[in-house]
């Protein structure tokens, strides 16, 4: 079988820095996933949108929620919310996208290295240690880059580290199925290093909070 390996060259890391213009929702197809219609919305899989002003008895399942776009077409997109059997209509609904800024000069990335906790269920009748897996810890995400204090993405990283606020991030691989990872994280540290006849380097450590969505 030929290799299906993905080249890392061309990968992009982005950080949320605001919001874009709201797009009008003209249709809602309940189910799992939920499919929404919005003419020429311009979203990409992995984008993040916040819903408002949808109507129907179960509109609260979407209104006010910030969700990851998946399975997009020119005029529709889906979100991973199970609305099977629910009543949600377009009304004057909108989807407002989160605006992301690319972090430039990245040399390498690593992470998504978490693991589930172990729950010890051994008792006096056990003949060997017994365990269940608990909640999954999504781990960390680290980027190594050449420092540029004028780069808007690097500025946003530093600002997030100072504020301690949670931020949305995207890792966009250059190819492959579901190439975009979207996640929330806290920038724990942004460090700099240098030496004789060297480029000034920077490293950012991001603690992931919650699930990672590939789309």
PLM features per residue range, with description:
Residues 2-8, 15-47, 52-124:
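Small/polar beta-strand repeat architecture
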Residues 33, 138-142, 166-168, 182, ...:
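Intrinsic-disorder/low-complexity, polar/charged segments enriched in Ser/Thr/Lys/Arg/Asp/Glu/Gln
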Residues 126-130, 189-191:
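Short structured motifs
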Residues 130-149, 198-212:
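Oligomerization/assembly interface segments of phage tail-like spikes and tubes
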Residues 153-184:
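Short, acidic/charged, Gly/Pro-enriched secondary-structure junctions
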Residues 172-215:
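Short beta-strand and beta-hairpin "edge-sheet" elements
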């Amino acid at each position: 079988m030929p290799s299906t390996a993905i080249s890392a060259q061309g990968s992009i890391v982005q950080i949320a820095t605001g919001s874009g213009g709201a797009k009008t929702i003209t249709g809602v197809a309940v189910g799992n996933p939920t499919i929404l219609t919005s003419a020429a919305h311009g979203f990409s899989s992995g984008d993040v949108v916040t819903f408002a002003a949808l109507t129907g008895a179960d509109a609260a399942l979407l209104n006010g929620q910030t969700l990851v776009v998946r399975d997009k077409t020119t005029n529709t997109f889906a979100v991973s919310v199970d609305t099977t059997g629910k009543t949600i209509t377009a009304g004057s609904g909108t989807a407002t996208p989160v605006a992301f800024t690319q972090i430039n000069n990245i040399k390498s990335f690593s992470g998504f290295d978490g693991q589930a906790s172990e729950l010890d269920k051994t008792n006096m009748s056990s003949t060997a240690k017994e365990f269940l897996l608990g909640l999954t810890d999504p781990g960390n995400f680290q980027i190594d880059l050449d420092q540029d204090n004028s780069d808007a993405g690097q500025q946003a990283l530093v600002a997030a580290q100072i504020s301690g606020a949670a931020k949305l991030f995207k890792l966009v691989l250059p190819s492959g199925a579901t190439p975009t990872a979207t996640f929330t994280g806290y920038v724990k540290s942004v460090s700099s290093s240098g030496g004789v006849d060297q480029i000034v380097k920077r490293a950012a450590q991001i603690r992931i909070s919650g699930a990672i969505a590939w789309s």
